């Protein structure tokens, strides 16, 4: 509007236009601007103000799943923390007291490894002797210092993302109060009878010399040796089976010295087979008689290079439990002289293998379960039920594996040892090997060392899943940890809902929880035991002893357990009894699983969380846990078990999970591929708000993708949103809220936009309540770009810029834009936390000191007008046809601006014609004039196939161009005082003149 004339005497109409004015820059400069906003949040104690203004509201507590205090944050951390921040901010603005106390997981093997590497191995120093109390405590202090360093580094990195929380008072599992409470939680399990020491096969890391939980392993591709092995039948001693062998298949030949049984299934059809032809040098010999599953016999003979065989007869499965075999290594070094029974097991299938499963109770959960289930019967039959310890902590076979002592399953570096080949060689020498091969399959690896783990029988501490829990010394039949956990899952809200089935399956099928680790840096299993001589132990239950332990931990930390004289100190007057101090430490998942106890239930250290009363307890407060989907077997899982075991219910009301972050091609990120995205670099280059927008624009329930192109698109989306905010701020520079126009006095277009505002408000509030941030971003982007910028703002620019100061239409438009700006800044605040804060301070310097202290706007339902919206659907359909026609004219260079046009719209439908009767289509279509005609249009008229009965012919606008508004009108020149403008613009100039503005 208004163009400068070459004639210097021409009027300067620009100063009479209400053009946008704002200090909100077009270029965001987020990397430079965001740190200033962070500083201001600290200066005004934003988190404290949030708590103060929300006092008395229902609490919504997002309990932070603690990241590990080791190294800088990665893109997965950024996504997780941003999601949490969006939850807490949006719940606060929905009317809750939304608390967020950040936390860290500080104990465990990764930190031990770093200390050993940096402080010992790299310097050629020997690792401390943990039997020495002073050395143990000194090493733990090194670990504590390391964790504290990275906690502080990560804290600053998380704050830079715009995360608002109680950063000055975070929780950490290594603080003294936390260690004390973790010990108390363990004591509760001891008191209710579910804590026990037993000998069971557990996943063992040879490299790290410790037991691992399921949550500490990753399944990776691994190639294993496979063998088909013959177990000669010894009973019955006569008949068809007397010369036969039962054939098993295994991917772990090294476990064969630990074999004590063969499992079969009474649901499988078995047969007796005889080899009638085989190569002379074959392991499988002509004349061998074998028992196999009928379904698998052909494949077994193929692997054994058998050229001909015959089926002798079927063998009823229900007769197999009477069969006994000799061990295939019988006689080696004087060992393996025991009977190998056949046991019926539900875990046996005929999908692969032979239909029989080699059963080594010291090397597998199912093996252990079936062996112990049959132990009493086996003893009656004269078969010892003792489980051997055939592999030691170094992955070496022991003296209980005669002939193989010292052979390594895995060496200290995690590489394959010589045990497999030694066992296979012995099988060949005894004519017990039928075939061998190699199999690539998924196998458990340590999440830290990335090396394969083994299953080995070892004394460990467990929490029982299926023992009746004895609260207050009284046990109720069926009240088990598994039953409690499954019930708790059913009353928890899972987002997305599929998470419920996932964790239900895990809890339903999981073994007892192994909670002991043979390491140094952690909370000790702070109990005293009396040995029973069979690997189990009696746990001392003594309130006075327990109180001395927890009080010491509270003041001195868990290092007190390792100090000289700890046994005597804590046992007190019971020190003369035969109680031993346990040296193992707790699984770190027990630490983090106990965080609810020392964060949500400790108002002394976390006063903002005082008096939480959850809906599950008859209150009105809500606790949410939010982590990646892998935490169904991690933190969600351990927290559920810990809380159900000690409190009878889950520690959470809502559990939200997100997927993993991949590169933009859908590949897993790795340094070797060079496809990682460093959040620190994104922040440095583009700003944290770009990362925040990316997080909220993705479907977090699935795996997310990120990379240069995706970030480029995110920046473009951000630019459009920022420009819309900037235009609103600039336009509102001229708004006096004292001149706001009442809804009933507004033009139709303004009332339509308030109807749209009401619709958008309902959508945004619902999406935030459902944690559906993708819908929030997508709907707001569409609303701001399409509904506002491309439609409403475009139409109203002439009114806003050129109307006289007294214009009711201009004031009505400003009133609507004020409501739009207020709502949009608040709606976007949880997502674009820095940008909206910057805009808010310019928009409402007289209001709350931060947009994050506001609430989302209440319902705009009083603005709803469905009939008006339906009418304007017709108007917009006509507008779309006119716009299409104008684009063709512009492309043909018959017009430049749309203001050079005067379209003629032909409308065939009389009802539609009535709808358009009172609409200023020139204003709506941004043309200088307009004409609507009833009836059919000429053949050359422009049409759109999706708008029936409307056609447009574009003619040039008649008249003279207004020097102020650029409209071409026949009335330009009719005002003698201002002959080069339209009457509307002449009136505006007179009002400006009265205000002292001359041109």
Curated annotation (Swiss-Prot):
The protein's assembly and partners: Monomer.
HAMAP family membership: Ile_tRNA_synth_type1
Main location: cytoplasm
Superkingdom of this protein's organism: Bacteria
Residue ranges annotated as motif 'KMSKS' region: 668-672
Family from the record: Belongs to the class-I aminoacyl-tRNA synthetase family. IleS type 1 subfamily.
PROSITE patterns: AA_TRNA_LIGASE_I
'HIGH' region, short sequence motif: residues: 67-77
CDD domains tied to this protein: Anticodon_Ia_Ile_BEm
One cellular component (GO) term of this entry: cytosol
Cell location: Cytoplasm
This enzyme's EC code(s): 6.1.1.5
GO molecular function, one term: ATP binding
PANTHER family: ISOLEUCINE--TRNA LIGASE, MITOCHONDRIAL (PTHR42765:SF1), SOLEUCYL-TRNA SYNTHETASE (PTHR42765)
Pfam families: Anticodon_1, tRNA-synt_1
First-tier enzyme category under EC: ligase
Binding site for ATP: 671
Species whose genome carries this gene: Nitrobacter winogradskyi (strain ATCC 25391 / DSM 10237 / CIP 104748 / NCIMB 11846 / Nb-255)
Name of the protein: Isoleucine--tRNA ligase
Sequence positions that bind L-isoleucyl-5'-AMP: 627
InterPro entries documented for this protein: aa-tRNA-synth_I_CS, aa-tRNA-synth_Ia, Anticodon_Ile_BEm, Ile-tRNA-ligase, Ile-tRNA-ligase_type1, Ile-tRNA_ligase, M/V/L/I-tRNA-synth_anticd-bd, Rossmann-like_a/b/a_fold
Biological function: Catalyzes the attachment of isoleucine to tRNA(Ile). As IleRS can inadvertently accommodate and process structurally similar amino acids such as valine, to avoid such errors it has two additional distinct tRNA(Ile)-dependent editing activities. One activity is designated as 'pretransfer' editing and involves the hydrolysis of activated Val-AMP. The other activity is designated 'posttransfer' editing and involves deacylation of mischarged Val-tRNA(Ile).
Domain statement: IleRS has two distinct active sites: one for aminoacylation and one for editing. The misactivated valine is translocated from the active site to the editing site, which sterically excludes the correctly activated isoleucine. The single editing site contains two valyl binding pockets, one specific for each substrate (Val-AMP or Val-tRNA(Ile)).
Source taxonomy: Bacteria, Pseudomonadati, Pseudomonadota, Alphaproteobacteria, Hyphomicrobiales
